């Protein structure tokens, strides 16, 4: 006999994610922690407590923290015991064996006793109930047993929590009328859906995150929510921009568009873009089997509203005139082609002639392969312009490395700043993890290319969060002799 602890929640097939229940579920409560294979339940082990529902009479979406749809809860192996606890603290051991038609409950309860009596009646009489929700095919013994279990629980919960019939999916199959959602704390699950759901639990069971099937739901509601790629928490999209694309749950810095970064750094009304009409002409006539290079450029222009993977211009930062270039990873991975290199070079030359400080915000996968050696020469061209700017004119260049900064950008102007600033958690490398592992046939340790690791190796200067970045830049400029045009 194998025992499992379940964090069981009821959800409808139509509302299987984040639904609220309209009535207090006094008879049905929340289970508790993982038994770790022990035969004796540890009811009061707070370290293994997952979640509890409040005793209030109504429930909103916030009361149901985790839903993970499972199409067939009876696909678990037979001869199982699962343990539940109601809102009054009473615990029950429920055992059912589908093959031998056994259903037992170890404690007297109105909810579970009614279920047990229903099953006993079914076993003794071999006939289905008159309830309209029990209308299942009874010709196959195993099929009818499975569906009778489902329909009994379905019917009881309908009456207990006052769920109207219109919520039902309308299917004639009882097993489709409701979906019982389980988050299992066991080491393995036998079932058809268990393989498609990647569930991770921490040591105390308080942080359970489903990754696989949740992505489809998140895509459906991506106009409302932004999912953190670190903790998988959801952030309300309407307020996400005002939070500087920082996850409210874990503080992780998510990617920002170039326009959002300009709005974050530049004083309102002072932004003056440069070379906006400069576009690539496909210099080597690169054509792939999937999509021609020109067509790909056009599609990214429509998608992002940008002409290229970098925006350059002049503006003011806390009243200090600056020249700034911001790369956008959403445009072909921020790859550096001839247009990107030319725009950055012109920006540096303009700043050299006007004696302006330069900021470059890097977010790139490296040189653009569709332009061949012309993209590689941009590294030398930008570095040459920076040499004149820094060494001859003695001006101040700040490089800001965001996630990801790799390839040719890392090998050129990304690492040439007088001050090199990195964002928290930024992925910074010359060759990416996948490229290194495929080339050298060696495993790259996790975190070895993160900003925090590189910082301790002396690769750059400070790690600055976004909410402090503008103030830090302002102090750096004033320290190097660049002051606001108007004193407050």
Swiss-Prot record:
GO terms of molecular function: acetyl-CoA carboxylase activity; ATP binding; carboxyl- or carbamoyltransferase activity; zinc ion binding
Biochemical pathway: Lipid metabolism; malonyl-CoA biosynthesis; malonyl-CoA from acetyl-CoA: step 1/1
Cofactor(s) of this protein: Zn(2+)
This protein's UniProt keywords: ATP-binding, Chloroplast, Fatty acid biosynthesis, Fatty acid metabolism, Lipid biosynthesis, Lipid metabolism, Metal-binding, Nucleotide-binding, Plastid, Transferase, Zinc, Zinc-finger
A Gene Ontology biological process term: fatty acid biosynthetic process
UniProt: Zn(2+) binding residues: 228, 231, 247, 250
InterPro entries: AcCoA_carboxyl_beta (IPR034733), Acetyl_CoA_COase_Trfase_b_su (IPR000438), ClpP/crotonase-like_dom_sf (IPR029045), COA_CT_N (IPR011762)
Pfam family, one: Carboxyl_trans
GO cellular component terms, semicolon-separated: acetyl-CoA carboxylase complex; chloroplast stroma
All residue ranges annotated as the CoA carboxyltransferase N-terminal domain in the record: 224-488
Zinc finger (C4-type): 228-250
Recorded superkingdom: Eukaryota
Co-factor binding details: Binds 1 zinc ion per subunit.
E.C. no: 2.1.3.15
Localization (cell): Plastid, Chloroplast stroma
Reactions that this protein is recorded to catalyse: N(6)-carboxybiotinyl-L-lysyl-[protein] + acetyl-CoA = N(6)-biotinyl-L-lysyl-[protein] + malonyl-CoA
Record region (Disordered): 189-211
Keyword Ribosomal protein included in the entry's annotation: no
Stored HAMAP family: AcetylCoA_CT_beta
Subunit organization: Acetyl-CoA carboxylase is a heterohexamer composed of biotin carboxyl carrier protein, biotin carboxylase and 2 subunits each of ACCase subunit alpha and ACCase plastid-coded subunit beta (accD).
NCBIfam families documented for this protein: accD (TIGR00515)
Function: Component of the acetyl coenzyme A carboxylase (ACC) complex. Biotin carboxylase (BC) catalyzes the carboxylation of biotin on its carrier protein (BCCP) and then the CO(2) group is transferred by the transcarboxylase to acetyl-CoA to form malonyl-CoA.
Family membership: Belongs to the AccD/PCCB family.
Protein name: Acetyl-coenzyme A carboxylase carboxyl transferase subunit beta, chloroplastic
Gene name of this polypeptide: accD
């Amino acid at each position: 006999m194998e025992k499992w602890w379940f964090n069981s929640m009821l959800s409808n097939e139509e509302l299987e994610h984040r639904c609220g229940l309209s009535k207090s579920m006094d008879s049905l409560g929340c289970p508790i922690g993982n038994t770790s294979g022990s035969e004796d339940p540890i009811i009061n082990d707070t370290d293994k407590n997952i979640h509890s529902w409040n005793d209030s009479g109504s429930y909103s979406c916030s009361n149901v923290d985790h839903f993970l749809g499972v199409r067939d809860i009876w696909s678990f192996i037979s001869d199982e015991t699962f343990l539940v606890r109601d809102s009054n603290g009473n615990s029950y051991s429920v055992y059912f064996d589908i093959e031998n038609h056994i259903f037992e409950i170890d404690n007297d309860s109105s909810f579970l006793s009614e279920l047990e009596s229903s099953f006993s009646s079914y076993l003794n009489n071999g006939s289905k109930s008159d309830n309209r929700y029990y209308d299942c095919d009874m010709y196959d013994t195993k099929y009818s047993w499975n569906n009778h279990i489902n329909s009994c629980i379905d019917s009881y919960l309908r009456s207990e929590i006052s769920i109207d019939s219109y919520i039902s999916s309308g299917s004639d199959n009882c097993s489709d009328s409701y979906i019982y959602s389980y988050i299992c704390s066991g080491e393995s699950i036998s079932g058809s859906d268990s393989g498609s759901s990647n569930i991770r639990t921490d040591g105390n069971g308080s942080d359970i995150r489903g990754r696989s099937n949740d992505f489809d739901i998140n895509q459906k509601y991506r106009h409302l929510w932004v999912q953190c790629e670190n903790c998988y928490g959801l952030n309300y999209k309407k307020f996400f921009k005002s939070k500087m694309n920082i996850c409210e749950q874990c503080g992780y810095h998510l990617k920002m568009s170039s326009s959002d970064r300009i709005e974050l750094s530049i004083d309102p009304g002072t932004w003056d873009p440069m070379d906006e009409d400069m576009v690539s002409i496909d210099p080597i006539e690169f054509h792939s089997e999937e999509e021609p290079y020109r067509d790909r450029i056009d599609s990214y222009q429509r998608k992002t509203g940008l002409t290229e993977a970098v925006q350059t211009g002049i503006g003011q930062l806390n009243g200090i005139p600056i020249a700034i270039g911001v790369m956008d990873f959403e445009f072909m991975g921020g790859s550096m082609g001839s247009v990107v290199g030319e725009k950055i070079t012109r920006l540096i030359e303009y700043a050299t002639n006007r004696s302006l400080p330069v900021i470059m915000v890097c977010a790139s996968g490296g040189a653009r392969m569709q332009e061949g050696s012309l993209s590689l020469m941009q590294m030398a061209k930008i570095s040459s312009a920076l040499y004149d700017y820094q060494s001859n004119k003695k001006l101040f260049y700040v490089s800001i490395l965001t996630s990801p900064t790799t390839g040719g950008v890392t090998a050129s102007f990304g690492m040439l700043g007088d001050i090199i600033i990195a964002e928290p958690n930024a992925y910074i490398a010359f060759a990416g993890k996948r490229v290194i592992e495929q080339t050298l046939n060696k495993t790259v340790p996790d975190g070895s290319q993160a900003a925090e690791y590189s910082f301790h190796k002396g690769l750059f200067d400070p790690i600055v969060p976004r909410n402090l970045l503008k103030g830090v830049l302002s102090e750096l400029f004033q320290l190097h002799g660049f002051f606001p045009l108007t004193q407050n």
